[in-house]
Amino acid sequence: MSGTVIRSKTLEDAHAHPEMIRSGAFSPAMQAGPFLYVSGCIAGDLSQDMTGQAQQEFSYVELVLQEAGYQLTDVVKLQAFITDAANYAAYSAVRKQYFPQDPPASTAVISGLLIPDALLEIDVVAYKDDK
């Protein structure tokens, strides 16, 4: 099955890390049937703490979803890669702001990341019946 590439028109406004924008090595998202797979994202302002980085990343994910005709309530799976378990509570608090009810299935992994000073990387899968 081939998919449709979703190219975010406003990546720079979405708080995405500049290296992600410049690389062009991957698509911000790929739609395959009713599913939308949003690539892992890293905050643009890495001087912020976990709360700030998480807010940037969820804002980015929300924008990519909207550009593809989806919304946060369509997210069925979320993966988070966190560099330090001590930051999990801060990440979780932000996550609850974006998914206050019926949160998606989720996985959190403690892991190193490719971008120095990044505390978090998230990716999501969304599903929509009418796609």
Question: What function would you assign to each model-found segment?
Answer:
Residues 1-76, 82-131:
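N-terminal presequence-like segments and the immediate start of the first folded domain
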